[in-house]
Amino acid sequence: MAPDHDHDHDHDHNHDHDHGDDEFADELDEFLGEFQELLGTDPEAAMELVESVDESFASHPLIRIAHAHAVWVTKGAASARAELEALVTAEPDFSDAHYALADVYGELKEDALRVTHFLRVLELDEKDDAEAGFDASAFQGLIVKSAEAALAGLPSPYLERLKDVPVLLEQRPSKVLVKDGFDPRALALFEGPTVESAGSDEISAPSRIVLYTANLPAEFEDEEELASEIEITLLHEIGSYYSLSDEELDRLGLE
């Protein structure tokens, strides 16, 4: 199995705080955008930024998780652990906090705790989508079209070789998969024997590529960006299937 861990998820969360008006929401979005950019380029500056917020805003869950991420990047997972544990205790329905804590536990090799919080993420994401009236099926047409375009554009011999590998759509990873440690917010799944092991006596299921129709739109709301990411995600899964080298991935368009 090869889940895609390269993206931060972005579910909307409706917490009732004193600053729940539109103006505050806009300011928060602007702040978090600046914070995320700094976190990737200058983590120390990101820490300074998040610690400079007004005390009246500092208790907001999104500010608290931003601070925890800054601690994680600048001081390590062990330092971020207590902060995230306190956050999920205070905000037990905040799925992003459970997700971040699961990743911290993963880095600390606390696999059982990681799975516990991954399962909570799966439960909360399903609940959040239901309450928001999110319909993943509305994106199926775009996802199918983008996947077909990606496959049709493959260079030989991959196009011919993939004719027997099904590309399936599922809303999100199953509970069984997540219990096994699979990321509940993965964009895609490669499952089954690789080409090299296709002759093994241990094969019990055909290879398949799964795209998760609830997770992809949650990550990329703009249709053009979503279509591009579907293609990239699918190509990564093809790369996993064939165990391609970096040079071979370049041929597929994954520089």
Outline where the language-model segments fall.
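Alpha-helical protein-protein interaction scaffolds
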Residues: 27-132
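Active-site scaffold of zinc-dependent metalloenzymes
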Residues: 189-231, 241-255
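Charge-dense, low-complexity intrinsically disordered segments
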Residues: 22-25, 40, 74, 137, ...
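Short alpha-helical functional segments enriched in proximate histidine and acidic residues
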Residues: 157, 237-241
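A metal-dependent hydrolase signature that marks the N-terminal structural subdomain at the beginning
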Residues: 100, 106-193
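Histidine-centered metal-binding segments
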Residues: 1-22
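Active-site beta-strand/loop microenvironment that shapes enzyme catalytic pockets
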Residues: 234
